[in-house]
Amino acid sequence: ADIQARHGQNAVAVYQGNPSVHNYGLMTHSNYFLGLLKTRNRFSATSVDQLPHHLTSHLMYGHGLLIPIPDIDHTDFMLILGGNPLASNGSIMTVPDVEKRLKAIQKRGGKLVVVDPRRSETAAIADQHVFVRPGEDAALLCGLLNTLFDEDLTRASHLPVSDLDAVRSAIAGFTAEAMSARCGVPAATIRQLARDFASADKAVCYGRMG
């Protein structure tokens, strides 16, 4: 109240993280509290974690809500980029007892790979933890895509796709070797990760901010 009295109502900001949507009390009553603050500055994980998925889904599938949800109970290869569901309980893929479900992938012969600059709780139980240089996730992804095209590992004949050749052309110069220098992941690791993902029967890539 003192800050707002001296600097105006909008001098106070509110940030709501992912756990907010896992708490019924916050979901049903937080708006009353926020209304009392009378600030227009409301922030959440949505701007960095959620909205990019909606935009991508709109561009790829025609609607912002057509976001693919990982089938954690049936996949045999799960690649997690930046996500830490053991701490956040997942986002989009919110499931009870997520640790048990991730370990079930391993028990049925599958593989869990986590890409994260730090050894998160989820990375600690993964079959493979790939340390990536902070801020260089895009370089790693470009290296993976380049390998998929370079080694003819794409299988899109059963899907209605468009402009795949444009993607292939755009990614042509982003070799695993070139991207390794950017992201800090060895080129051999990038290539093997792409091969493992492509060769799995039911692979899924899950990317979040936490």
Q: Where are the predicted features?
A:
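Cofactor-pocket helix-loop regions in the catalytic cores of large enzyme subunits
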Residues: A1-G210
